[in-house]
């Protein structure tokens, strides 16, 4: 008896997902491509090389790229932000080491919140009921 992994594929069956039909041309990143590349460059160099307690510097960089950052916010040097112009962080909140804010849509973090190390906030997913596996982006509010 063959296991399910040894069975021959059914080549005539319609695929559940057809990635040839995937299209995200409708998706709006919110800024032009050169601006996004500039942000990725700044984040890759300035964040990890900034001093341990340079929270103000990292907040300033995020604000420079459009994030709404409250007072007293602490952001660790290894935190990552996909599109800072889609992020708002309230007063006295902390973003821990290796936290990733994957902001295809808005991410709003209130005051006095902690997004701890290695947290992954993801506003994007895919519609696995759709044969084209289209992108879904939904805001996160904490």
What residue spans do the PLM features occupy?
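Terminal amphipathic alpha-helical/low-complexity segments used for targeting or macromolecular assembly
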Residues: 1-67
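Flexible, glycine/small-residue-enriched loop-and-beta-strand segment within the central core
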Residues: 49-60, 76-89, 94-142
